[in-house]
């Protein structure tokens, strides 16, 4: 009888959480990241993706793609973690053992589905998605197959907000025509090597002989990919060991011989390690930089923060402060950035501008959202730095008369707040003096308004 592994992937998770808790953003292109335009996109709504914007893209590029209707909001990881915890509690309740892959995706293998028909699995998956939607308000895509590899591919095919199943008997029909890059373990280097051999699809790889695999990809990795392509995947669904550290390093084909080249490499590694940190869902207290010189000497330096952070600017600034340069140590061949001291508890930075590499002057901003009857939206968000009194772009705020809201505009001594949560529908806008004593900073989690 067939086993059924289910992969659940929350759709555009960070952006969906923002649209859930800030109803005015629903249906609009939303980018999650630094409102100033520096750094990279942490999340993009499907409305933004239709313009070509995506996660890990430079923010300035994504903003140019989505145009004037786009809205950029600062990330609120406390909200994402709370939503993630609720989703995974549902998966455990309905599916049993959960293998968490990241903050927004995981596997289950419900015992009740062993030997079930595709129709029965579809009914179960529909029920799971309905429970997730009912208890969190968030969309989820579900994929199912005879192993984790196929289930993961199927959830990608199900997006957005759908279900896609592939029974073992359908493997050749549904999987073989897909690009070989869909397989786990086939990165750019392996894909290029396979293309040189004329291997473009999963089916092309599956039809290769064992000897061809051994010669072209090796007996270990090659045979593993070959078996996955053929649909053989008996890996069990089991809880993963909690990572103690996250690290990214790159070896460069040409030695780095300038300070600028080293800084660029550190920024690249910082962004990639930060992306993995977001997937993990925790914050890091220690930032490390690893350098390997042209003569193979290795030097590692680290710094420990007084708090766990998941702020990209903080990670990058700390890594740059740890840098050593070619005029000090000679040509550099490898650059890596590591994050450790991972903790669930995370502290928001009171003065994030102190951690930035490049100081910027305070400027006015206005987040480009408006009441539903407005036909044109304009975004001129240029700086998320706090004002002298401490307000920041898209910050959560509380007012005793109007409740929970978020900063939509700030400048010339005035602050504009839109008051809304998950349950209110699009909220009304109110403008106050920035020093209004009735305004106070709010816990972002309260925007979820879960009882």
UniProtKB/Swiss-Prot annotation:
Catalytic residues as annotated in Swiss-Prot or TrEMBL: 105
Any one Gene Ontology BP term: error-prone translesion synthesis
EC number: 2.7.7.7
Cofactor(s) listed in the protein's UniProt record: Mg(2+)
GO MF term list: damaged DNA binding; DNA-directed DNA polymerase activity; magnesium ion binding
Catalysed reactions, semicolon-separated: DNA(n) + a 2'-deoxyribonucleoside 5'-triphosphate = DNA(n+1) + diphosphate
UniProt subcellular location: Cytoplasm
Protein name: DNA polymerase IV
Keywords: Cytoplasm, DNA damage, DNA repair, DNA replication, DNA-binding, DNA-directed DNA polymerase, Magnesium, Metal-binding, Mutator protein, Nucleotidyltransferase, Transferase
Similarity comment: Belongs to the DNA polymerase type-Y family.
Top EC class of this enzyme: transferase
HAMAP family membership: DNApol_IV (MF_01113)
Source organism of the structure: Corynebacterium diphtheriae (strain ATCC 700971 / NCTC 13129 / Biotype gravis)
Swiss-Prot/TrEMBL site (Substrate discrimination) positions: 14
Residues binding Mg(2+), per UniProt: 9, 104
Annotated Gene Ontology cellular component terms: cytosol
Domain UmuC, chain residue ranges per copy: 5-187
Stretches that traverse the bilayer: none
Cofactor note: Binds 2 magnesium ions per subunit.
Source species, domain of life: Bacteria
Function according to Swiss-Prot or TrEMBL: Poorly processive, error-prone DNA polymerase involved in untargeted mutagenesis. Copies undamaged DNA at stalled replication forks, which arise in vivo from mismatched or misaligned primer ends. These misaligned primers can be extended by PolIV. Exhibits no 3'-5' exonuclease (proofreading) activity. May be involved in translesional synthesis, in conjunction with the beta clamp from PolIII.
Stored NCBIfam families: PRK02406.1, PRK03348.1
């Amino acid at each position: 009888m067939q086993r059924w592994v289910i992969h659940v992937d929350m759709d555009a998770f960070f952006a969906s959480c923002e649209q859930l808790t800030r109803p005015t953003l629903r249906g609009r292109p939303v980018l999650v990241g630094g409102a100033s335009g520096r750094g990279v996109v942490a999340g993009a709504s499907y409305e933004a993706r239709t313009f070509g914007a995506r996660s890990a893209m430079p923010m300035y590029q994504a903003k140019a793609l989505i145009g004037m209707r786009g809205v950029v909001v600062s990330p609120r990881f406390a909200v994402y973690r709370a939503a993630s915890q609720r989703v995974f509690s549902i998966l455990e309740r309905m599916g049993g053992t959960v293998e968490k892959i990241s903050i927004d995706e995981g596997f289950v293998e419900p015992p009740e589905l062993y030997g079930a028909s595709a129709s029965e699995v579809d009914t179960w998956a529909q029920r799971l998605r309905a429970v997730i939607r009912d208890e969190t308000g968030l969309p989820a895509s579900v994929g199912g197959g005879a192993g984790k590899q196929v289930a993961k591919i199927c959830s990608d095919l199900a997006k957005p907000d759908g279900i896609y199943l592939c029974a073992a008997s359908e493997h050749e029909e549904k999987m073989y025509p897909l690009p070989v890059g869909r397989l786990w373990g086939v990165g750019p280097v392996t894909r290029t090597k396979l293309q040189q051999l004329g291997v473009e699809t999963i089916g092309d790889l599956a039809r290769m002989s064992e000897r061809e695999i051994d010669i072209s990809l090796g007996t270990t990795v090659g045979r593993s990919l070959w078996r996955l392509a053929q649909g053989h995947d008996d890996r069990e669904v089991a809880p993963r060991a909690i990572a103690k550290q996250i690290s990214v390093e790159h070896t460069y084909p040409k030695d780095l011989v300038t300070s600028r080249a080293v800084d660029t490499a550190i920024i690249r590694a910082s962004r990639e390690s930060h992306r993995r940190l977001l997937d993990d869902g925790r914050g890091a207290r220690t930032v490390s930089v690893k350098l390997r010189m042209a003569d193979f000497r290795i030097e590692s330096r680290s710094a420990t923060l007084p708090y766990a952070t998941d702020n990209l600017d903080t990670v990058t600034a700390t890594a740059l402060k740890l840098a050593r340069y070619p005029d000090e140590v000679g040509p550099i061949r490898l650059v890596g950035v590591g994050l450790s001291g991972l903790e669930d508890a995370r502290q928001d930075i009171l003065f994030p501008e102190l951690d930035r590499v490049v100081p910027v002057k305070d400027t006015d901003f206005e987040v480009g959202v408006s009441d539903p009857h407005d036909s044109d939206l304009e975004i001129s968000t240029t700086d998320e730095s706090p004002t002298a009194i401490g307000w920041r772009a898209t910050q959560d705020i509380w007012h005793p008369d109007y409740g929970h809201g978020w900063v939509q505009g700030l400048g010339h001594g005035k602050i504009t707040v839109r008051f809304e949560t998950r349950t209110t529908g699009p909220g009304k806008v109110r403008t106050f003096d920035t020093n209004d004593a009735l305004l106070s900073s709010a816990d972002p989690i309260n925007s979820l308004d879960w009882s």
